[in-house]
Every structure is written in structure tokens, then in C-alpha cells.
């Protein structure tokens, strides 16, 4: 699998949240916890970032003003293993065409 991010792109990693009114019950908290766990499992399964590092970025209180989470820019996302490599649109298209050719060769 190929994952790519533009050098000038940014991504925000933060805990699951909602806007608006919610019912303040233990079940609501458990629902958010389960939803967040599914996201963490998906991201760590499909990238090279460890669960511990991803959670640390998600819960960081030093990066965002008056909020929890982290902002990563292109090179940082690659360095921590969240994204495979840097690239722009032409790089992504080239990778796509390579994957198509590989699939064609396998089916022959």
C-alpha cells in the first residue's frame, strides 16, 4: 500500500469529539471511547506508527492552543510513520499507474 502526503500539507490528530448537546451518561463516554479505539486500531494497522506514539500525538496538550492534539506537516507525518512518503499529485498518479500495472501483470 502506498500512502503519500504533500510536503506543504498538514494533518490534525485529536481525540474524538462532538459539537452540540450530548447526554452526559457513562454510556455516552463509553461510546466515544469505543469509537476512538476503532480509529486508533485502523490507523496503527494501516501505517507504521505505533499505538503509543499515535495516542501521545492525539493527547498532546503542548501543540495546540487551548486544545488537545497535534498538527503534523508533511515531513513530520512521514518521519513518525503515519504516512509512507512525501509526494504531490504527479507522484500519486505515478504510484497509482504502477499499482495498476502490477495488478495487470499478476492477473496475466
Where are these regions (language model features)?
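N-terminal organellar transit peptides
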Residues: 1-108
